[in-house]
């Protein structure tokens, strides 16, 4: 199989289906095409977190899923996106929400911390996928968000804030389409 060189590096701005993203990381995947870990440059909409701070069951997840569906209508082959596992451990360490495999989701606090030096500040406040504490605590209906200043805070899950999805895309999606590549033949599994 031909190996495709990644033409981007962390901090670069790329466009997929009309949405601009910042490259957070490049993952080398052996014989598979390298992948780019991308974060929407700005909010792509607004949503309440939901009735609890469990991202897996949230209105925020539904909003991201709807956005991803709309991206498909604008030309992004969602089947080519590489699932990533997000850890829904809350800020206080409660692991009650487990992990979740997603094609797109807001960053978790751990991811936001890891890429803090690369992430550009967005114009509006945006949710993270991380809850403040477990559901049995008095502040179990709070989740983390990032203010337009770049600071992290907690807000009640009923608040409406920006939706800023992150996703992993194979580098082949950024190859020149004039090369006549058949993307259906490119594996996305590891």
What are these regions (language model features)?
Residues 1-190:
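Collagenous Gly-X-Y triple-helix signature in extracellular proteins
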């Amino acid at each position: 199989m031909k190996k495709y060189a990644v033409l981007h590096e962390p901090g670069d701005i790329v466009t997929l289906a009309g949405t601009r993203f910042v490259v957070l990381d490049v993952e080398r995947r052996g014989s598979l095409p390298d992948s780019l870990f991308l974060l929407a440059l700005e909010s792509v909409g607004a949503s309440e977190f939901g009735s609890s701070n469990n991202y897996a069951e949230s209105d925020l997840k539904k909003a991201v899923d709807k956005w991803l569906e709309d991206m498909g209508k604008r030309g992004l082959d969602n089947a080519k996106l590489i699932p990533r596992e997000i850890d829904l451990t809350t800020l206080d360490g409660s692991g009650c929400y487990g992990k979740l495999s997603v094609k797109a989701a807001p960053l978790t606090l751990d991811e936001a911390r890891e890429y803090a030096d690369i992430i550009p500040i967005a114009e509006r406040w945006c949710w993270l996928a991380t809850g403040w504490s477990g559901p049995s605590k008095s502040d179990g209906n709070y989740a983390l968000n990032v203010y337009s200043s770049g600071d992290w805070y907690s807000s009640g899950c009923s608040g409406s804030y920006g939706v800023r999805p992150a996703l992993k895309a194979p580098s082949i999606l950024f190859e020149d389409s004039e090369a006549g590549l058949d993307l259906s033949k490119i594996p996305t599994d590891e």
